[in-house]
Design a protein with these regions (language model features):
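Conserved acidic carboxylate
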Residues: 16
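Charged docking surfaces used in two-component/phosphorelay signaling
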Residues: 23-31
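Acidic, metal-coordinating helix/loop segments flanking the phosphotransfer/catalytic sites
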Residues: 38-57
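Active-site residues of response regulator receiver
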Residues: 61, 91
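The feature encodes the CheY-like receiver
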Residues: 65, 83, 95, 113-114
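Short, glycine/charged-rich "phosphate-handling" switch motifs in NTP-dependent
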Residues: 108
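C-terminal output helix
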Residues: 115-125
Length: 132
């Protein structure tokens, strides 16, 4: 994952409970020059979201313990200061109903796991450019 040099690192928020996926994503994103804040479950993610400034982008797993990704998405979209933050939903299965619900609730995009690192990079760069 390569990105253009920046004066400061952009922060991305990752909510992912599957340890292997979280480690891989953090590695790819940090190697790409981003700072990654990670939550391992929905409850932890909600607490962190309530305490941190808005990141450049959110990667949000749909199937999280305690609060699922759709519940977190609704929580994020209710926060005025997070309204502009792009959100990419991550899903292990391409359940059309979940994807439609996520997009209708305010997600900007979704990716089905496993995903191609180059595709992830392209989507991140597209949304971060649009948001800035």
């Amino acid at each position: 994952m390569t990105t253009a040099p920046r004066a400061e690192k952009l922060t991305l928020f990752l909510a992912e409970d599957e340890e292997g996926t979280a480690i891989l994503l953090k590695f790819l994103l940090e190697r790409g020059g981003y700072t990654v804040v990670h939550a391992a479950d929905g409850q932890q993610a909600q607490t962190m979201i309530d305490q941190m400034p808005p990141p450049a982008l959110v990667l949000l797993d749909i199937m999280l313990p305690y609060l699922n990704g759709l519940q977190l998405l609704a929580h994020i979209r209710q926060k005025a200061e997070w309204q502009h933050v792009p959100i990419i939903m991550l899903t292990a299965d391409s359940n059309e109903r979940d994807i439609e619900q996520a997009l209708a609730a305010g997600a900007n995009d979704y990716m089905v796991k496993p995903f191609n690192p180059r595709e992830l990079t392209a989507r991140l760069q597209r949304f971060i450019k649009v948001a800035s």
